[in-house]
Regions:
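Extracytoplasmic copper-binding redox domains, predominantly the cupredoxin/blue-copper superfamily
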Residues: 3-128
């Protein structure tokens, strides 16, 4: 086999292996709403990548929300999202309810529980 044909064959083989490699699967990150001794998100800050999903779960009897909307926050600094991104809101989450959001834009998202923002129930998602 000539040198040019061998290089061509090796190049095609390498491209085929690269093209066949599976894409990295999107991750799902879990956040739990806790009530004792105070209302908090656990963990309070999560890091994820574009395409990942965060799922919040309320295992307790106290109603909570996941609200990333400055218009609904008492302190606008507690609900922040990247420019051009639409706000999101779980609405009221009763016991055992879950809410999921897939992040498609890089940036820092600060969110609140509408019922407990004044008590410090705030969280952050950092998307890279």
């Amino acid at each position: 086999m000539s040198l040019n044909r061998r290089v061509f064959t090796q190049t095609i083989a390498a491209v085929g292996v690269t093209a066949a490699a599976p894409a990295m699967a999107a991750a799902t990150i879990e956040v739990t709403m806790k009530n004792n001794p105070k209302a908090i998100f656990v963990p309070a800050t999560v890091n994820c990548k574009v395409g990942d999903t965060v799922t919040w779960t309320n295992p307790g009897v106290i109603t909570h929300s996941v609200t990333c909307d400055p218009a609904q926050a008492v302190d606008k600094a507690n609900a922040v999202l990247p420019a051009g991104v639409q706000p999101f809101d779980s609405n009221n989450m009763e016991q055992d309810a879950t809410f999921s959001h897939t992040f498609t834009v890089k940036g820092t998202y600060k969110y609140i529980c509408k019922m407990h923002e004044a008590m410090g129930m705030v969280g952050t998602v950092v998307v890279s």
